Structures are given as structure tokens and as C-alpha cells.
Amino acid sequence: MLFSAQQLTMFGVPANPEIAFHIFHDESGTYVPGAGDRWLLHGVLFVPEAKRGEVFAALQDVRQKTGYNEEVHHQKLRQSVTGLKARCATGWLRFYFGQFSDFCFYHCLAVDTHSPDFQHDRFGERHHAYNRFARMAIEGAIAWSLKPYARVALKFHSDVKSRKEGDNFAEYIPSEVCLSIDEKRKKKPAAYPEIRLLHPEVILVESDPSVVMSDLREECECVQLVDLMTGSIGQALTGRSGQRAKIALAEIVGGWIEDTRQPPWLQSEDLHRRFSVSCFPNEQGHFYNPALATTSKDQLSLFDALEED
């Protein structure tokens, strides 16, 4: 994909320099027509290449301080909120909010498969739905968080999955995202940045740090962070798990979600265009803001959990 010629300033410096981002993707929920989970979530984290080392060092610092060196996986969190795993997970979320969100942008697309407007017949295979919604999440994130950038270069990463023969996820996502953004730019050129691919396929990354290849250690940590954030959003939406550690993390991200639902001038967490969750479709086929399970009185609060542990 080619860019137009760069415009230079009077000092010979590009007026709109290209910014390179790594996109990390993971999902929560399983799609099975007529069964499976109600909510399918696809989360994506945009990490600037220039900041990737800083992000990795900060995540490693939390590991060192908590003494936890195993995989940080939302599904494996249990009751204890003061154990090493939960403390590391909480530390990662706090670091994202307090530091990473200044330059790392996260977006989650939450798809309600029980909505009357959800069109099951559009997807002949389960992976068709998976790939389609992953693509939608990435395009939504580009439109919302990368709009201020004129030119970006992208490299895609996702957690390793067992994929059915014929599933072209690794090739489909980069090419279709770029084609779609190009078409949208023809209609609204100021709404999207120009895009160049740094790698033609999604790089599949093992999320277990004990087995990941040494040259993908930084990517491994970021994939785990996306899993943690996306799983916590799923818990905030559904309240499905009674595990105290998951409830505690859901309260954290639930607060971010509620704040970003306010008009920008009323938000207090400074996450506008940095952290976002989009839910769809409602009965009219539109995006909407469903009530969060974390606002239910039946949910165990973070402070109660800490006192009981």
C-alpha cells in the first residue's frame, strides 16, 4: 500500500511523520449459533513502536514487585484478591490507567448475539463471525483513536489459537482492514489516517511466557494485557463469574466504562479516545450502552473482597 508523497516543512522535516503502532488483539466469549456465550468481545491495544520497550519494562516491573512470573490470564483468576496472580493483574490494570493510556489506546467491541437484530445467517462458519468482529474492532479503534494521525504503519499480533482448516484469520485481518480503511478514506479522507502494513499477516503470539520464543517476549506481555482487559470488560458486562478476583478487576474497568459514557467535558478519568467499549446491536441494530453487572448490588465490591480475603 503506497502513501502519497510526504509534505516537508521549511526545515526539510516531514510535516506529517509516519507513526508505527503494534496492534495486539484477543477475544473473550465463544460463538456457537443457537448456543455459546451471549457476548462476544474483541479487544485491541495500540502500542506505539517507540513506546513498546517502556511498556514491557513497566509490566516486568510489576511482575518483579509482586513475585508473579507465570501467565496473566483472566480465565485463571480465582477467589483471592491478594494472591500473587491477582496482585500482578491489578497492577497491570493500574499501570495502564495511570501511565499507558497516555499513549496506548484500547478499544473493545462487544457483540450481543442474543439481540433480535443479530444476523446469525450471515456467518456460515464460526470463524467467519470471529474474523468479522475482530476486523470491526480494529477498524473502530482506528477511526476513534488514530484519527489525529495523518499516517500510520501497523503490525498486527494476536494470541495463538487452534484454528479450523480454511480459517484465513492471519491473512484476512491486515489486508481487509487496509482495504476497508482505504475505501472509507475516499469518502471521508480526514476521518482516517493513511495506513501502511509493516507485516502482511497477523503474527500469532504464545501468551504463556514460559514457552514463548525469546524474540516475542514483549509481544507476549502485551497479548496478556489485552486478554486481561478484555476478560475484565466481559465480567463487567455479564457478572457471570462469582470469583472475587474477577469481580474486583471488573469493578476497575467498569468505572472506566461508565466514565467514558459521559460527554467528554464531564469525564473525570481522562480516557476520552484512549479507552472505549462499543456494544451492539440493540433491537434497532445500533450501538448502545447496556447496564453493567458491576452496578448490581449482588456483585461483591472490591473493598468487601479485600476485607474477607
Model-derived features with residue positions:
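Phosphate-ester processing/binding pockets and catalytic centers
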Residues: 1-309
